[in-house]
A protein has these predicted regions:
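Core nucleotidyl-transferase/polymerase catalytic module
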Residues: 126-448
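Non-catalytic, polymerase-adjacent accessory regions of viral genome-replication enzymes
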Residues: 1-148, 414-448
Length: 448
């Protein structure tokens, strides 16, 4: 129980000590990994058909609020004003590096909306030259996405899916169009409410809520795994071409490391390039439906300009206090689950997008994510240890930062020091700055 006159400095210090190593990314035991994979299967199996009335309300709200935006995205893809692309993520079909740019496989589902001759070939000559070694897979020939685990905490791993190369190629292209369109001036108000680009509005709104209680913050459990295919089909119902492209680039089955293969009832697992933006839209629509209920409106009467200040970033939701009791019930209607441990509707604490607030004071903590490095080849671990050092140093925990620095000094003779806040992979310092190592020479491609 928190005292009403709690000292902010003491409160922040206690939280920092207790949470410092709460999310170290270490491999879990085989038993915990198996439990996580079983939970993945059980969650997907638990997704039920959404009742007709709530589903229609969802369609009505989607049409009222997102039709212009989704139509603009659809128009870009339909007209060919887009470029499918790859990301650096691992692939279920195992292509590495440059080989992912020369794949020779497509699917009938994709071909129904996007001809491989248009999306993959640079010229008619290339089409002719590749006809013999190009294959178009029937739906029952498509490989599943590959579900795997990566370290998250010592309690449970994070579960992600690796997509086949052709699916990822299209997903990334659609994501790029969605991102460009949402940044257009005509959709500024929409972007103020939901986003997959900027967390700061969430953090600021959470701060305001901690001061006057005017906003409630919600976190969802298993958010990606609980967004059903049925819900996404309803979201895109008025845009058949866009819906076709999105669903054709979606893996319908998933294969787990246990050997189990399941037909997915969810829209997509974490790892799909469209998982985050699509779920952001879904959660935005549900927030709006909750507001409509509070106002006594039908969802079809909703308008973007008539909505109050609210916010969605992935599964971090913020709504006015007036709908704080309505939203959880609405979320559950659509198969979603509120994480009550990380949701705050009353009291002086609010949390969103990694920022924690108590009566307007920042009580966020820094966390050790990986064990300290032991060798030069641990590039990512070294980079993240430098980041940990800088977070600890800027927060005033100099002895903790010193331990990180000692581990790095055991590998490198000397790491450069730069002013606090500098965006370089170097140790932050308030005073001991190596002035000759704070500029990146673009020609020599090294720090000067």
């Amino acid at each position: 129980m928190l005292r009403s006159d709690a000292d902010i400095t003491a409160f922040r210090a206690v939280r920092q000590i207790l949470l410092l190593v709460s999310k170290v990314e270490l491999p879990v035991t085989p038993r915990r990994e198996l439990e996580a994979l079983r939970g993945y299967i059980e969650t997907d199996a638990s997704l039920e058909e959404i009742p007709e009335l709530p589903l229609q309300e969802f369609k009505d709200a989607s049409r009222a609020l997102l039709a212009p935006y989704l139509a603009a995205v659809e128009s870009r893809i339909w007209s060919g004003d887009w470029i499918p692309r790859h990301s650096s993520g691992a692939l279920a079909t195992r292509e590495m590096y440059n080989s992912r740019h020369s794949f020779r496989t497509w699917t009938e589902r994709l071909q129904s909306f996007l001809l491989w001759e248009d999306e993959l070939a640079f010229s008619y000559r290339e089409i002719v030259d590749n006809l013999d070694d190009f294959s178009v897979l029937a739906p029952d020939q498509e490989p599943p996405s590959k579900v795997t685990t990566v370290p998250k905490t010592m309690k449970a791993p994070r579960i992600i899916a690796e997509e086949p190369v052709w699916n990822q190629f299209i997903q990334q292209g659609v994501l790029h169009v969605m991102t460009e369109v949402i940044q257009e001036p005509r959709f500024r108000r929409l972007a103020d409410i939901f986003s997959w680009l900027d967390q700061e509005p969430n953090r600021e709104l959470a701060r305001v809520g901690s001061v006057d209680g005017s906003y409630a913050t919600f976190d969802l459990s298993e958010a990606s795994d609980r967004v059903s295919l049925q819900l996404v089909e309803a979201l895109l119902a008025q845009h058949p071409f866009l819906k076709g492209v999105v669903l054709a680039s979606r893996s319908r089955t998933a294969k787990l490391s246990t050997g189990d293969e399941i037909v997915l009832k969810k829209f997509a697992s974490m790892g799909s390039s469209l998982c985050f933006p699509i779920e952001s839209m879904v959660f935005f629509i549900i927030e709006a439906i909750a507001w409509a209920e509070h106002e006594g409106m039908v969802p079809s009467a909703l308008r973007v300009r008539g909505l109050p200040r609210m916010r969605v970033y992935g599964d971090d939701l913020i709504v006015p206090q007036a709908v704080a009791q309505i939203l959880p019930r609405r979320l559950e209607t659509y198969g979603l689950k509120v994480n009550s441990r990380k949701s705050f509707t009353t009291g002086p604490i609010r949390e969103s997008c990694g920022a924690d607030w108590y009566l307007g004071s920042d009580i966020s903590v820094f966390k050790l994510r990986v064990p300290f490095p032991e060798a030069e080849h641990q590039f990512e671990t070294i980079s993240r240890t430098i980041e940990f050092h800088n977070n600890a140093y800027s927060a005033g925990w100099f002895l903790v930062a010193g331990q990180a620095e000692l581990s790095l000094n055991g590998i490198f003779r000397k790491l450069p020091r730069v002013p606090v806040g500098t965006r370089l992979s170097a140790l932050w310092s308030w005073d001991q700055v190596d002035s000759g190592a704070v500029r990146l020479d673009p020609k020599l491609q090294r720090r000067q």
